[in-house]
Amino acid sequence: MNFIYEKEDIKKKSDNKKVGIDLGAHKLIADSNGNFYGKDLYDVYNRLANKKRGSKKYKKLLTYKKNRVNELCNKFVEDNIDCDIVCENLKNVKHKSSFYKSVNNKLQYWSYRQVIDKIETLSESKGFTLIKVDPSYTSQTCSNCGAVIKANRDGEHYHCSCGLEIDADTNAAINILRRGAYCPSLQKT
């Protein structure tokens, strides 16, 4: 059986409004406007790490996580429908690292790849551009004065000697946005 359908031509947005996003485990998406999506998912990662793989509860929770991530991505795109999106190019992220075993167990459920894939799919259907930039030092750089000091980030808070006090993920999203604004030719999809 074959289906034939007509696909509308998507008109690219002509204005240059952009939003930067920082992807994380505690907040799935933090944007440069100070909005957060998916704060509740870290609890799901914890519960998944404690469930026996293959059990009914594990599979149900995994399905819930996948559906929740899709729901959050759709909400984020709807909230920023008139903006191009600048995100981190996280192609080299490893789930196994020098963290404690318990942290590695939670990180394996982090859905960054699902988020990027979903936003890429939505970018094609909704007509916005997805720009991927190098994530190096975005969470350590002050979005106000540009100082790169690792000690300025204390968990989820960012404090700089210039007087800036901001959520660390919002600070990183602002830095990601700036990289995308100054390098518009980087890896557009």
Where in this protein do the model-derived segments appear?
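Positively charged, helix-rich recognition surfaces that bind polyanionic ligands
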Residues: 1-189
